[in-house]
Design a protein with these regions (language model features):
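Glycan-recognition patch characteristic of GH18 chitinases/ENGases
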Residues: 55-160, 165
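SH3/SH3-like (including bacterial SH3b) beta-barrel domains
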Residues: 3-17
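Boundary regions of SH3-family modules and the immediately adjacent low-complexity/disordered segments
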Residues: 35-69
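Conserved small/polar residues in nucleotide/adenosyl-binding loops
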Residues: 345-351
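SH3/SH3-like beta-barrel superfamily modules
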Residues: 14-46
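Active-site groove signature of glycoside hydrolases
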Residues: 163-192, 241-243
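Hydrophobic faces of well-ordered beta-strands that scaffold small-molecule active sites
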Residues: 75-77, 103-105, 136-138, 178, ...
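Substrate-binding surface in catalytic domains of secreted glycosidases
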Residues: 113, 164, 190-323
Length: 351
């Protein structure tokens, strides 16, 4: 069964003689079919035999998906770990915090289209976190630019390899859960992505691992992440309630204004049960630099989204302590914005 009609189209699933397929539509010499496992794709007409019509029963009962639900509020922090040596910073990191019960180190990354991963997981890290009363939900990302999300997620074999590697690494290191942080998923990959979440949820459930999935603030352009289905399959759905304005923004603004955060929570609650929703807040802000565009820059922006903005904007991310220090050093006055519910300040270049 292939992604599209044609012998050169990638294979989605191998089927064998005797397998039952549901025909959805005819496309020239190919038929659009659905396999028993729910994969939709195309197969040559000549490969199909004994076609017959069946009346499908509508008496369907939604299965009861069991999962893991903690009897306490999740207070989670992501811990950016970029090397095995950086795992040793867990003691200092936790010493500066209080109230946490979950930590999510950035340990796993998908490295190729076959579903292999890199890992900097540490059992010593896990043991120390457990001693401090914290669960460890290891994060996996898809940030490697050499990985094609369609190639990775549209094939059963690569999904299974990725799922098995994640669960095996979790079990080997005593990890309590997996946090999926797949970003910038193309629209046409959405169905394959949610299939990955479905399959991973089964493995996690069998092995008593918590599954959490990171999501953008809901917008029309990211509905293909299938939040409602995530709300069924995952134990927790995490809103990345920040990046309202980000490094590539055309105008300066808040990282997470009140209404933006409120919208993210309310829209997510339309699809996901409240006891599964976690909202992530930023512990950083941005220092913005605005300069009037030159004639050359305005010409370059013609016909693009940037055309309607008169200022050229750059920024750098600052942790909250560094941001406060910069404000103090500049002798700037901090103002409270009643609409955004954030503090801000601004300086002219000659001040």
């Amino acid at each position: 069964v292939r992604i599209l009609g044609g012998v050169k189209s990638p294979v989605l699933e191998e089927v064998k003689k005797g397998d039952k397929l549901t025909v959805l539509e005819d496309v020239s010499d190919w038929k659009k079919v659905c396999t028993k496992s729910g994969i939709v794709g195309y197969i040559q007409k000549s490969k199909l035999k004994d076609a017959k019509k069946e009346t499908i029963s509508r008496e369907f009962e939604e299965p009861d998906y069991t999962g893991i639900k903690k009897d306490y509020k999740i207070n989670l922090v992501w811990h950016q770990v970029t090397s095995e040596a950086a795992n040793e910073g867990i003691e200092d990191a936790l010493a500066a915090t209080k109230g946490l019960n979950t930590i999510s180190p950035t340990w796993f990354s998908v490295t190729d289209n076959s579903g292999n991963i890199s890992s900097i997981a540490s059992t010593d890290y896990v043991d120390y976190a457990h001693q401090c009363g914290l669960e460890v939900w290891a994060l996996v990302d898809n940030f490697d630019q050499n990985v094609d999300d369609m190639e990775l997620l549209s094939h059963t074999s690569s999904r299974e390899n990725l799922e098995n590697q994640l669960v095996n690494a979790a079990l080997q290191n005593g990890i309590d859960g997996i946090n999926v942080d797949f970003e910038q998923i193309p629209t046409d990959v959405g169905d394959h992505y949610i299939q990955f979440i479905r399959e991973l949820s089964v493995l996690c459930r069998v092995n008593n691992l918590v599954l959490s999935v990171d999501n953008y603030v809901p917008k029309g352009y990211n509905t293909h992440y299938h939040r409602e289905e995530q709300g069924v399959m995952a134990d927790y759905v995490i809103i990345m309630g920040y990046d309202e304005h980000f490094a590539g923004s055309y105008e300066a603004g808040s990282v997470a204004s009140y209404n933006y955060v409120k919208e993210g929570i309310e829209e997510t609650l339309r699809d996901v049960p409240a006891d599964k929703v976690i909202n992530a807040v930023p512990f950083y802000t941005r220092l913005w630099n605005e300069t009037p565009k030159t004639d050359e820059e305005r010409a370059e922006d013609q016909g693009t989204e940037a055309e309607s903005y008169s200022m050229k904007v750059t920024s750098e991310a600052l942790g909250m302590e560094e941001a406060a220090q910069r404000v103090s050093e500049a002798g700037a006055t901090v103002t409270w914005d009643d609409t955004a519910n954030v503090s801000y300040t601004h300086l002219r270049a000659n001040e």
